[in-house]
Amino acid sequence: MVSVAEIRQAQRAEGPATIMAIGTANPANCVEQSTYPDFYFKITNSEHKVELKEKFQRMCDKSMIKRRYMYLTEEILKDNPRVCEYMAPSLAARQDMAVVVVPRLGKEAAVKAIKEWGQPKSKITHLIFCTTSGVDMPGADYQLTKLLGLRPYVKRYMMYQQGCFAGGTVLRLAKDLAENNKGARVLVVCSEETPVTFRGPSDTHLDSLVGQALFGDGAAALIVGSDPIPEIEKPIFEMVWTAHTIAPDSEGAIDGHLREAGLTFHLLKDVPGIVSKNIDKALIEAFQPLNISDYNSIFWIAHPGGPAILDQVEEKLGLKPEKMKATREVLSEYGNMSSACVLFILDEMRKKSVQAGLKTTGEGLDWGVLFGFGPGLTIETVVLHSVAI
């Protein structure tokens, strides 16, 4: 008779979880950051708030963002004037948009990832869908299953309202699924859209204005699996270790609340300080077992919540400017896309590594770290190992 231990052993994969393919997608509507304050104050009928507009212009100028992509066009906003007010009841209108566009943009990214993977979609065994944009039943995971024509018995996981750290969360979950289910191929999708958070300016709630200066729309998809099939599946990164922690004394640093007026965000001024204060401990826990203490010797993928967070992390750890190059590039070209950001950075890094003729997908280095920061204040850590190009 076969023992439970033997059954469990047979169910597990042999090797580490690997990222086998990456796809990204954005709405067609591109917004230039330099002209966004004019558009934003005009469409929200707030042009009379001259001092506030000047303050918002300075926020945009300091954001290090060149452009963002947004589903919300001038035409859509004119058709939904209550979305343009600061706290007008508008949840139904926001939800009606989000439940359609979130899975649709996720599909665009997923199709690209599946194409790069090169295997039939019938081999997908698990689906993880993550969004902070809208809530519905059945969820965006169900809608994507239908849009892609996946098998009805694909094992689905729907993650709502996680926020900006969730790019790390989906990798942690995908790693566990791939390594504990032999032959599993996990489709991971993060799709984020701004209809739930867009609103007019407020003189008294400047943290809301910070979000309006930073957030953009985007979706990213990955195929994750262990024991890649030789000559058919080509891993891009290996996921070696993950951790999840709540930073001490950080309650209320970042939080969001779903109200009749949509999803409202609240930020403390010292979020960059809280992140930089706690990142050293996270790195020691992750890299001490590998005998790595020089954090300039690894590649970096950090959620770009804003330039201040990246600046303080660099200063705290003495990082060279090039360490955050891929992260800053994604922030510049797309803005803060919440959970999707770190997956965009993974894609950016592996592409630039190939273009530059480097020896590995991690900027020529072997080891790297991926950080997600978000509500809680929650920190997700993923230790990555690059793959030879």
Curated annotation (Swiss-Prot):
PROSITE patterns: CHALCONE_SYNTH (PS00441)
Origin superkingdom: Eukaryota
Keywords: Acyltransferase, Flavonoid biosynthesis, Transferase
InterPro entries: Chalcone/stilbene_synt_C, Chalcone/stilbene_synt_N, Chalcone/stilbene_synthase_AS, Polyketide_synthase_type-III, Thiolase-like
Protein's UniProt name: Chalcone synthase 1
Highest classification ranks of the organism: Eukaryota, Viridiplantae, Streptophyta, Embryophyta, Tracheophyta
Source organism of this protein record: Medicago sativa (Alfalfa)
GO molecular function: naringenin-chalcone synthase activity
Single Gene Ontology BP annotation: polyketide biosynthetic process
PANTHER family: CHALCONE SYNTHASE 7, HYDROXYMETHYLGLUTARYL-COA SYNTHASE
SUPFAM superfamilies: Thiolase-like
EC number: 2.3.1.74
